[in-house]
């Protein structure tokens, strides 16, 4: 990523303070060309991401959190922001960092666009940000198809500040307000509850309440639960934002301390992830029932995901599923606790596809199946979780490949053919190590290599006229040479330069095609292995019946 000239930095953040960070970024890029950083012209805003950040996004880029904790209360000395998500253990995972020295709509848009370019991947399906107009507009410009959510705990925090007099005068207001926002099950129920609170406490003309009501589609649970946000819960929990740097970067952190704290946070979370990986692989959670479905979930999910599943599964013992309509292959159930039918949920079940949908939408929101669908599965004697309800991102095999760093080549391999060679060699070494673990894996690896060799050979010998990404035809080598000779008759040296440039472009494209094909094959292998493991699990469960 090209570095743009640094302009005069704003406010109290001096060049000397930022220079400490820039020197670190330059050194990291020299050590690893896959480390990217960029500086916004005229503003001095800085962005950076290492290869692990970009690899994390390929695994867990199904939702994004833009953490701007530094903006709360203007107490922070360092305007440090982070792009984060959730890994398969529910832990925060880093996608990139930024220093935001100048806040404007265009600066946030630049930052989002730069981050997206660095990820070399599609935009996230959903994003969580603090409630702020500048950020909201920038998100709509860059992530036009991404579902925007405002941090609910942040809104609660600001509501408590702006309505402190109400909280003090009316002790019941807080619980009523939270229940209205988090516990209502339909839009109509929310509207009725909100209207009741506003009228009862004479707050019809309160500007703050009116503003957050107008934005209800972006933060009230009943309106956002149909979208995946990567949290192992139907609410946002106690954290303000998914802060990867909580406990490491705070109001006392100076620019000189930032890099040290940044690296401490990365090391800490890496260690926590490794411990969670080890626990998931080498220990078995305690079963609470003799159900084969619970055992299946324990063998596939990470510990954090399994605990959430187990909570839902155990609750099925107290919520019967009652049929309210049945058309043969499609059955509708009402699922509720004994004596609480008015708080129940509706589940539609397709017996042909073994597919169910619940009005609580917990699976859509968190990726873990809800107790209501599990109760229907129990009633229909479904003993194994269908594969559609086992999101790979919550399983022990969420990371398709074991590599932690993987350079991206957004412009093919023109920047460095040596980097291409070294990257492929590193990947091949890791592939060999995995493929030599057993005879069975070796055979699979050899078959994949044979297939890869065929695809690479086909790509290398592709016919002239290959399409470019912008839809223009890529001319044949002869045509390019003719054009070079015709359009540049001014000298042999210039013609040679153009020929070498063209050859470099072709080599870069072949390198990129080879890399893409190899990655595709490896992903296919991992997906087939995952699906096979599900089939084996289901087969074992069938034998036990």
Curated annotation (Swiss-Prot):
Regulation: induction: Up-regulated in hypocotyls by far-red light treatment.
Main location class: nucleus
One Pfam family recorded for the sequence: SWIM
Extent of the signal sequence: none
Chain ranges of the MULE domain: 66-150
Renumbered zinc finger spans (SWIM-type): 345-381
PANTHER family assigned to the protein according to its UniProt record, in alphabetical order: PROTEIN FAR1-RELATED SEQUENCE 10-RELATED, PROTEIN FAR1-RELATED SEQUENCE 9
Phylogenetic classification of the source organism: Eukaryota, Viridiplantae, Streptophyta, Embryophyta, Tracheophyta
Family: Belongs to the FHY3/FAR1 family.
Region of interest (Disordered), ranges: 460-495
GO CC, alphabetical: nucleus
Biological processes per GO annotation: regulation of DNA-templated transcription
Species for this entry: Arabidopsis thaliana (Mouse-ear cress)
Protein known as: Protein FAR1-RELATED SEQUENCE 9
Residues in FAR1 domain copies: 22-65
This protein's UniProt keywords: Coiled coil, Metal-binding, Nucleus, Zinc, Zinc-finger
General function of this protein: Putative transcription activator involved in regulating light control of development. May act as a negative regulator specific to phyB signaling.
Subcellular location: Nucleus
GO molecular function annotations of the record: zinc ion binding
UniProt tissue specificity: Expressed in hypocotyls, rosette and cauline leaves, inflorescences stems, flowers and siliques.
Residues forming coiled coils: 492-545
Keyword Zinc-finger assigned: yes
